[in-house]
Amino acid sequence: IIGLVLGYFEGLTDAIGARLLDTLMAFPFIVLVTMTLVAIGPSNLTVILVIGIAYAPLVARTVRAAVREQKQRDYVSAARLGGEGALAIMFLEILPNIRETILIELVTRLGYAFFSIATLSFLGLGIQPPSADWGLAVADGYGFLTGGKWWVVLFNSGAIVSLVMATNLIAQGIGAFENSDA
């Protein structure tokens, strides 16, 4: 919704919102998430919320760009001339036309979120025991590397990589499916 509003309304709203998004995106992701989790304390819900909030500016920026592109189209001008208000144009006209972009962005970020959760769990800041997490499993198996038992880490790491790759392939598939309809 933030990206939708910033993309539709130009001027001061867009300028302030875009600079705020740029500021949030300027912080290194892992540093921002780590500092927040250290300050708040790790729990399953906290980890998910912090990662979701950390990825929100990236999604908002993508949606903003898509809205700005769609806003120049004739169907938006026709809706304005037809007397539709800003909310109706944003939610009934523009939003359905950028659903593919939003869906691809969300699925891609979901894969990155899985990797981020595993990374934080490996560092001891993510999902906490006794909850099951691949990052915790990699951290537990890390000590076995010196004993020559590399497969303990390999299979769990491979599962993480496979999940991230699968979400990226799903996002590409969504894009290919949507583009084949056009």
Stretches with model-predicted labels:
Residues 8-9, 78-97, 138:
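Short helix-to-coil transition segments within interhelical loops
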Residues 4, 33-38, 47, 51, ...:
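Transmembrane alpha-helix boundary and packing residues in multipass membrane permease domains
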Residues 8-12, 39-41, 83, 107, ...:
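Helix-loop interface residues and adjacent transmembrane-helix termini in multi-pass membrane transporters
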Residues 87-120, 167:
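Transmembrane alpha-helices
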Residues 51-54, 100, 104-108, 149-182:
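C-terminal transmembrane helix and the adjacent membrane-cytosol boundary/short C-terminal tail
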Residues 25, 36-39, 66-67, 116-155, ...:
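Glycine-rich helix-loop "coupling/hinge" segments at transmembrane-helix boundaries
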Residues 2, 7-69:
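Generic hydrophobic transmembrane alpha-helix motif, especially the helices
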